[in-house]
């Protein structure tokens, strides 16, 4: 073979070792060594008689179009990158890639066809500014990353049932996706795609982390548990309906969703870390969290809401801040919650458009914190205002963030206002 990296004796030995580990008997001509690089279609034609190749294959260089014929399995990875003249690629016989499928920096590639591909470890599609179609028959994959492409559809991933990572970001023509995913063991992210992105994950039962940004509509018809963090940030969602969700293991953030007018989490009972709802300008009535009983970190609600129903809340292990610009909002129920010792953190603040209550809580005694509330009102007010300024800055900064910032973080439960502010700041990165 006239691969750019010719097979040396060492490579042949490596190929033999790989072939020995394969479940299929591989002719020596189909073992390409630990890795090999093809720079022309003629290189690929020399392995066209193989049903399986062993080794990591890289395709790069000045190819106008390229195809892998007859090959059904790659026992290794396939990488196609940095080819300024490659306009199309097809490998419609491949059913399995044991390693990764990487497609990167292919500036005029318009189509990529893997019509029979059912199994791969990871797919990474990054910086494909001309691609419009990508086809597979994918059934099993661990990680999917699609970033900075012109894909109008990612339906090639619609039949997947479970993944570790599913990250779709910065694809400006992608406006919809309907998924069959049932579980996500690491992170699910959709961010900075088309202006009116509509998503449906109605088979998803559990996920470790979920972060959605710049989404117009979302459906989670079956979601019951999020093990770590759940975040809805900078979306144009008119409503959120997660009526099957019962537990968020760490942080829950609903921040800077300007069109959001209704949030229904009618079965949610537990938030293990920080719980923040902030800067959702149309969310005037917050009554969809009335079954929440425990918050493992701090809680902060900031906005223009007139109604807040947290009637089942029994325990907040961090501080609490409720700040509404509406003069119709009443702090009475929340002050009763605080006086009963349910707020276990270092501060309690409740404000509306007309009045403000600020109490510095003792970390050692609920009773002493009550008795010191009056004498320390002035100093605690100053401290609370300082914390409010920091928190407001963290919340408002999210409104200008329209880029994907990587996998959703697993946040440590916050134990104070500063903790929840730090948690949200990390979530917004």
Swiss-Prot record:
Q: Give the function comment from the record.
A: Required for proper cell wall integrity and for the correct assembly of the mannoprotein outer layer of the cell wall. Important for apical bud growth.
Q: How does it sit in the membrane?
A: Lipid-anchor; GPI-anchor
- Which GO biological process entries does UniProt record here? cell wall organization
Q: Which residues carry this modification: Phosphoserine?
A: 339
Source organism of this protein record: Saccharomyces cerevisiae (strain AWRI1631)
- Family the UniProt entry places it in: Belongs to the SPS2 family.
A single Gene Ontology CC annotation of this entry is: plasma membrane
What are the glycosylated positions?
21, 56, 82, 196, 209, 227, 234, 241, 267, 279, 304, 328, 389
Q: Which residues form the propeptide?
A: 407-429
Write out the PTM section of this UniProt entry: The GPI-anchor is attached to the protein in the endoplasmic reticulum and serves to target the protein to the cell surface. There, the glucosamine-inositol phospholipid moiety is cleaved off and the GPI-modified mannoprotein is covalently attached via its lipidless GPI glycan remnant to the 1,6-beta-glucan of the outer cell wall layer.
InterPro entries the record matches: CWI-Assembly_Regulator, Rcpt_L-dom_sf
**Which intervals of the chain are annotated as region Disordered?**
361-410
Q: Where is the lipid attached (GPI-anchor amidated glycine)?
A: 406
Nucleotide-binding listed as a keyword: no
Name assigned to this protein: Cell wall protein ECM33
Where does this one sit in the cell? Cell membrane; Secreted, Cell wall
Tell me the leader sequence span.
Answer: 1-19
Q: Where is the composition biased (Low complexity)?
A: 361-401
Keyword Endoplasmic reticulum appears in the UniProt entry: no
């Amino acid at each position: 073979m006239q691969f750019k990296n010719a097979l040396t004796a060492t490579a042949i030995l490596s190929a033999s070792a790989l072939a020995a580990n394969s479940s299929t008997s591989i002719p020596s001509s189909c073992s390409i060594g630990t890795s090999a690089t093809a720079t022309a279609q003629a290189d690929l034609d020399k392995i066209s008689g193989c049903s399986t190749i062993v080794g990591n294959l890289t395709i790069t260089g000045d190819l106008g179009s390229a195809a892998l014929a007859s090959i059904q399995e790659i026992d290794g990875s396939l990488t196609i990158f940095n080819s300024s003249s490659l306009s199309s690629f097809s490998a419609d016989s491949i059913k399995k890639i044991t390693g990764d499928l990487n497609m990167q920096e292919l500036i005029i590639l318009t189509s990529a066809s893997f019509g029979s591909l059912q199994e791969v470890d990871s797919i990474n599609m990054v910086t494909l500014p001309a691609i419009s179609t990508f086809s597979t028959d994918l059934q099993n994959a661990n990680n999917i990353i699609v970033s900075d492409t012109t894909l109008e559809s990612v339906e090639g991933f619609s039949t997947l049932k479970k993944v570790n990572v599913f990250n779709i970001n910065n694809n400006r023509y992608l406006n919809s996706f309907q998924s069959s995913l049932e579980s996500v063991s690491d992170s699910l992210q959709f961010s900075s795609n088309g202006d009116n992105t509509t998503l449906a994950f109605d088979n998803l039962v559990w996920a470790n982390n979920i972060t959605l940004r710049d989404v117009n509509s979302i459906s989670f018809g079956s979601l019951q548990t999020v093990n770590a963090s759940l975040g809805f940030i900078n979306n144009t969602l008119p409503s959120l309906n997660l009526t099957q969700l019962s537990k968020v293991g760490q942080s829950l953030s609903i921040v800077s969703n300007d069109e959001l007018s209704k949030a229904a989490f009618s079965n949610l009972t537990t938030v293990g870390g920080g719980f923040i709802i902030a800067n959702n300008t149309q969310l005037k009535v917050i009554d969809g969290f009335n079954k929440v009983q425990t918050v493992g970190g701090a809680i902060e609600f900031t906005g223009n809401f007139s109604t807040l129903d947290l009637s089942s809340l029994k325990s907040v292990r961090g501080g609490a801040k409720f700040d509404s610009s509406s003069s119709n909002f009443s702090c009475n129920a929340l002050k009763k919650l605080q006086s009963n010792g349910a707020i276990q953190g270092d501060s309690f603040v409740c404000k509306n458009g007309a009045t403000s209550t600020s109490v510095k809580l003792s970390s050692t005694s609920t009773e002493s914190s009550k008795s010191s509330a009056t004498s320390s009102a002035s100093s605690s007010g100053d401290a609370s205002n300082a914390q409010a300024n920091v928190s407001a800055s963290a919340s408002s900064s999210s409104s200008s963030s329209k880029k994907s910032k990587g996998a959703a973080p697993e946040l440590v439960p916050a134990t104070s206002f500063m903790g929840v502010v730090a948690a949200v700041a990390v979530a917004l990165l």
